[in-house]
Each structure stands twice: as structure tokens, then as C-alpha cells.
Amino acid sequence: MAVISMKQLLEAGVHFGHQTRRWNPKMKKYIFTERNGIYIIDLQKTVKLVDAAYDYMKNVAEEGGVALFVGTKKQAQEAIKDEAIRAGQYYVNHRWLGGTLTNWDTIQKRIARLKKINAMEEDGTFEVLPKKEVAGLNKERERLEKFLGGIADMPRIPDVMYIVDPRKERIAVQEAHKLNIPIVAMVDTNCDPDEIDVVIPSNDDAIRAVKLITAKMADAFIEGNQGEDQATEELFVEETPEATSIEEIVDVVEGNNESAE
């Protein structure tokens, strides 16, 4: 029983890759065909690989692991934050600060500063400070919250990273490699799959595609933490005889194209 259906993937535009002139040849095995200068991702493979990614994330959760969701492109920011929070995990959805993981001690000092400013507001310190100083502290807090708020309570270096568009998040990928942190990622036709431990071939530019896949990874973590006996039926879908086949995809490619130009 698959965690995601071909129909769901199709409706979210997961099959639309990049223009053929913007591709990584290593993605060839995940490509079904080309239409109108756009590569079409093989959704039969995506269905199976989403299952593999789901199981991987679930296993990490079952072992008490920590997950970091990363996606700083505009199309991913909302889903990354919302789904990480829903799963009780952590996220980076604005610019990745170099050393976020490889210089964890320094980052922890900045997080401590963020928490100190929050405490100053809560304990009434703000009320006795000059307005100009309070304004400066609020500005500092806003910046710290923007870049570090999603990892402020992360107890340690994560046990797995889920990344939307590893090509854009190359610094995060490099840091994960240095620290031997496994990566699960949405990988579009212009990415290098060899850099990723668990590949999910997918359009990483369509908001609906990002939300669909990211939600499934959050579902996996939730199930892993709850135990399978408590998992909701909605986490899984069964293919019906009417489910969209990969051949039918070609017929709709000329319609709603949400790939990156």
C-alpha cells in the first residue's frame, strides 16, 4: 500500500522537470520522456521512492531521532515551516547560515542571545529600558528569529535532513556530508542525485508538489513517533484501477506546466 498515489503526484505537478537544456545527466534514470522542451519525471519511480523515503524517515523517528527540514526557496518556505512544526521537528526556511551545523557551538550562542532577548521582554526588562534600546533589541530579535527560530529548540545535530532542492541548498548539503548526516531530498532534473542518500525525483518548483511531498515526510515522522497502531488511515492510499498511468501523463503535459523556466 503506497503512501502516495500516481494521481496525487500528477495533480500536484510533480512530474514536470526543468527545460531539457538545464538538466543533470545523472538524473536520466528518473526521467520518463521529454515533451515541448521539458523533461517529464517517471512517476512510477517517484511513487516507489516516496515509499522508501517515508520508511526511512519513520525509522529515524522510531529510534528517537531528530529531523531538520530545509527549504529556503520561496515555493518551499511555508510548507517547510508548517510541516516541520506539525511533526514536532525543526526547520530552516530562510537563508542557510554557513556553519549552522559545522559550527554548532557558535550558532548555539546566537540562539542563546535570541532566548535572552525574549526573556528580557517577558520579565519586564523592556519596560525600564529606553525606547531606542528596545527598538534595537527587537530588530536584533527579528533577524535572529528569522534565521534561527526554527532550530532554537533543536537539542542536537539532526539525525536526518530533509531538503527541498539540494542544488540551491548546496551549503547545507556540504555540511551534512561533513558530519555524516543522511539526506532525504526532493531532487529535480537539474540536481545531482549522487549527493543524496534517499532520492525523491520531483518537481521542486511547484508549491503544490513541495507541499505534498513535504507533508508525507512529516506524516512519516509523526507515525514513527506514535507507533504504527496509532497511525491514521489517511497516511496511506491505495491505487484504484482508474489511477493515472505514466503513459497518461504525456497526454496532459501540454497543459498546466509548473516547472521552473
From Swiss-Prot:
It comes from Enterococcus faecalis (strain ATCC 700802 / V583). Belongs to the universal ribosomal protein uS2 family. One of its GO terms (cellular component) is cytosolic small ribosomal subunit. Keywords: Ribonucleoprotein, Ribosomal protein. GO terms for molecular function: structural constituent of ribosome. This is Small ribosomal subunit protein uS2. GO terms for biological process: translation. The keyword Ribonucleoprotein applies.
